[in-house]
């Protein structure tokens, strides 16, 4: 891992280049994704079966997972796994319950009523990855907020493997309350949820992380359906001062690097000695990681340790990066929280490692990446509701303000708007 001692702007330039390189890859893949989406839109199930055989190496005739298969899945998982899943579910629910909001209205003495109705989406599709790793935790993180919001129908898609779907995924789906599960993955699954096929129902919104093909397919169908966000490769930034523990920091950086060769792992520190220790620890820990090949490629391609003169500058740099995950391994991390403007999720102190948020603590692990934490937020109950405004005026209330409406409408050249007000008071011309 490279240790960089350069000024602020040079560091930002390096990070910008990393993201631009990722965009070049995206442009190449986008053409392929567009073709897949169009074929599924036109050929429906036929295209689904074709792409499943082509990309997953599995020949299927029926994409729906049966109720019997879901029930039997519990026979193939460990009791310790089920206990961990139950604990995670409890924490996710307790955290997200506090996000629920109520419809509201206000009224005045003249009989003006204004308000907002909050309603759950009717149906959603959840994408659960199933490539180089299986993610039961993603099932809980995507489904439970939707259940709390009151979504009526939740459909899940996940790539098939030889022999079916990982039983841990099926158990998590059953525990979370998924209504229907389909063995389909990749861009073709996103297209099926967006347009519907003979087997898979069209949904109103698609959520859940996936690989580059999945992310670009979500971008392609946005507007036909709603989506949560365009999620890129995983990212972590660790800010550390001289109190940082090199073993902890290295382990946390590698926890993200092992996701994907395109993942980004950055340490920003004020202490050169700590930087050297972190570098050594990364090499040492890589030797024992089962996914060391992926993690090493990620570290070599997108990893760096930046030396800065102060924690203030470290925070400033982090705000420019706007990382998915930010860890603060510094004295009094809570005091620094107010200065963090842009980050998907923030982890304070040495005993709040990023995997705690990935699995168990309760806050959602579906987070904005690639700098989009500047304007996107973690997945929440709000993502599964929609809002409608309503208003009611009495004749007297409208009469009091009609001249303002007419003035504004005429200024915009929308005279029928003005007339719609005037006609109610015999002022037609």
Curated annotation (Swiss-Prot):
<feature type="binding site">
    <location>
        <position position="127"/>
    </location>
    <ligand>
        <name>NAD(+)</name>
    </ligand>
</feature>
<comment type="similarity">
    <text>Belongs to the histidinol dehydrogenase family.</text>
</comment>
<feature type="binding site">
    <location>
        <position position="256"/>
    </location>
    <ligand>
        <name>Zn(2+)</name>
    </ligand>
</feature>
<feature type="binding site">
    <location>
        <position position="259"/>
    </location>
    <ligand>
        <name>substrate</name>
    </ligand>
</feature>
<keyword id="KW-0028">Amino-acid biosynthesis</keyword>
<feature type="binding site">
    <location>
        <position position="358"/>
    </location>
    <ligand>
        <name>Zn(2+)</name>
    </ligand>
</feature>
<feature type="active site" description="Proton acceptor">
    <location>
        <position position="324"/>
    </location>
</feature>
<feature type="binding site">
    <location>
        <position position="325"/>
    </location>
    <ligand>
        <name>substrate</name>
    </ligand>
</feature>
<protein>
    <recommendedName>
        <fullName>Histidinol dehydrogenase</fullName>
        <ecNumber>1.1.1.23</ecNumber>
    </recommendedName>
</protein>
<keyword id="KW-0368">Histidine biosynthesis</keyword>
<feature type="binding site">
    <location>
        <position position="188"/>
    </location>
    <ligand>
        <name>NAD(+)</name>
    </ligand>
</feature>
<dbReference type="InterPro" id="IPR016161">
    <property type="entry name" value="Ald_DH/histidinol_DH"/>
</dbReference>
<dbReference type="GO" id="GO:0051287">
    <property type="term" value="F:NAD binding"/>
</dbReference>
<keyword id="KW-0862">Zinc</keyword>
<feature type="binding site">
    <location>
        <position position="412"/>
    </location>
    <ligand>
        <name>substrate</name>
    </ligand>
</feature>
<feature type="binding site">
    <location>
        <position position="211"/>
    </location>
    <ligand>
        <name>NAD(+)</name>
    </ligand>
</feature>
<feature type="binding site">
    <location>
        <position position="417"/>
    </location>
    <ligand>
        <name>Zn(2+)</name>
    </ligand>
</feature>
<feature type="binding site">
    <location>
        <position position="358"/>
    </location>
    <ligand>
        <name>substrate</name>
    </ligand>
</feature>
<comment type="pathway">
    <text>Amino-acid biosynthesis; L-histidine biosynthesis; L-histidine from 5-phospho-alpha-D-ribose 1-diphosphate: step 9/9.</text>
</comment>
<dbReference type="GO" id="GO:0005829">
    <property type="term" value="C:cytosol"/>
</dbReference>
<dbReference type="Pfam" id="PF00815">
    <property type="entry name" value="Histidinol_dh"/>
</dbReference>
<feature type="binding site">
    <location>
        <position position="234"/>
    </location>
    <ligand>
        <name>substrate</name>
    </ligand>
</feature>
<dbReference type="GO" id="GO:0004399">
    <property type="term" value="F:histidinol dehydrogenase activity"/>
</dbReference>
<dbReference type="GO" id="GO:0008270">
    <property type="term" value="F:zinc ion binding"/>
</dbReference>
<feature type="binding site">
    <location>
        <position position="256"/>
    </location>
    <ligand>
        <name>substrate</name>
    </ligand>
</feature>
<comment type="function">
    <text>Catalyzes the sequential NAD-dependent oxidations of L-histidinol to L-histidinaldehyde and then to L-histidine.</text>
</comment>
<feature type="binding site">
    <location>
        <position position="259"/>
    </location>
    <ligand>
        <name>Zn(2+)</name>
    </ligand>
</feature>
<dbReference type="InterPro" id="IPR012131">
    <property type="entry name" value="Hstdl_DH"/>
</dbReference>
<dbReference type="InterPro" id="IPR022695">
    <property type="entry name" value="Histidinol_DH_monofunct"/>
</dbReference>
<keyword id="KW-0560">Oxidoreductase</keyword>
<feature type="binding site">
    <location>
        <position position="417"/>
    </location>
    <ligand>
        <name>substrate</name>
    </ligand>
</feature>
<dbReference type="InterPro" id="IPR001692">
    <property type="entry name" value="Histidinol_DH_CS"/>
</dbReference>
<keyword id="KW-0479">Metal-binding</keyword>
<dbReference type="GO" id="GO:0000105">
    <property type="term" value="P:L-histidine biosynthetic process"/>
</dbReference>
<keyword id="KW-0520">NAD</keyword>
<feature type="active site" description="Proton acceptor">
    <location>
        <position position="325"/>
    </location>
</feature>
């Amino acid at each position: 891992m490279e240790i960089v001692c350069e000024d602020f702007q040079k560091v930002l330039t390096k990070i910008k280049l990393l993201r631009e390189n990722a965009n070049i890859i995206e442009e190449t893949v986008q053409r392929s994704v567009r073709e897949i989406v169009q074929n599924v839109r036109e050929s429906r199930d036929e295209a689904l079966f074709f792409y499943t055989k082509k990309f997953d190496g599995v020949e299927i005739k029926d994409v729906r997972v049966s109720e019997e298969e879901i029930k039997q899945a519990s026979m193939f998982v460990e009791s310790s796994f089920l206990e961990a899943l139950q604990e995670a579910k409890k924490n996710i629910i307790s955290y997200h319950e506090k996000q629920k909001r109520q419809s509201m209205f206000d009224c005045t003495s003249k009989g003006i009523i204004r308000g907002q109705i909050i309603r759950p989406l009717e149906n959603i599709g959840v994408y659960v990855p199933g490539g180089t790793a299986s993610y039961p935790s993603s099932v809980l993180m995507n489904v439970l907020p939707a259940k709390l919001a009151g979504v009526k129908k939740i459909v899940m898609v996940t790539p098939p493997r030889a022999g079916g779907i990982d039983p841990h995924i099926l158990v998590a789906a059953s525990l979370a309350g998924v209504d229907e599960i389909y063995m389909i993955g990749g861009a073709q699954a996103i297209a099926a949820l967006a347009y519907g096929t003979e087997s898979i129902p069209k949904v109103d919104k698609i959520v859940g992380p996936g690989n580059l093909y999945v992310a670009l397919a979500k971008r392609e169908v946005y507007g036909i359906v709603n989506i949560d966000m365009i999620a890129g490769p995983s990212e972590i930034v660790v800010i550390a001062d001289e109190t940082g523990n090199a073993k902890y920091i290295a382990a946390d950086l590698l926890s993200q690097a092992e996701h994907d060769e395109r993942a980004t792992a950055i340490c920003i520190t004020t202490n050169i000695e700590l930087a050297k220790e972190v570098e050594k620890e990364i090499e040492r820990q890589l030797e024992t990681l089962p996914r060391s090949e992926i993690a090493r490629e990620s570290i070599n391609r997108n990893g760096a340790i930046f030396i800065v003169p102060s924690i203030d500058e470290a925070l400033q740099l982090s705000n420019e990066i706007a990382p998915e995950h930010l860890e603060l391994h510094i004295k009094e991390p809570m005091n620094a929280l107010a200065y963090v403007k842009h980050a998907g999720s923030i982890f304070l102190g040495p005993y709040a490692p990023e995997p705690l948020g990935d699995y168990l603590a309760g806050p959602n692990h579906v987070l904005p990446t690639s700098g989009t934490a500047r304007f996107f937020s973690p997945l929440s109950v709000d993502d599964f509701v929609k809002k409608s405004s309503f208003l009611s005026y009495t004749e007297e209330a409208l009469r009091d303000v009609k001249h303002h409406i007419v003035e504004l409408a005429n200024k915009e050249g929308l005279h029928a708007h003005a007339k719609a007000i005037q006609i109610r008071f015999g002022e037609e011309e």
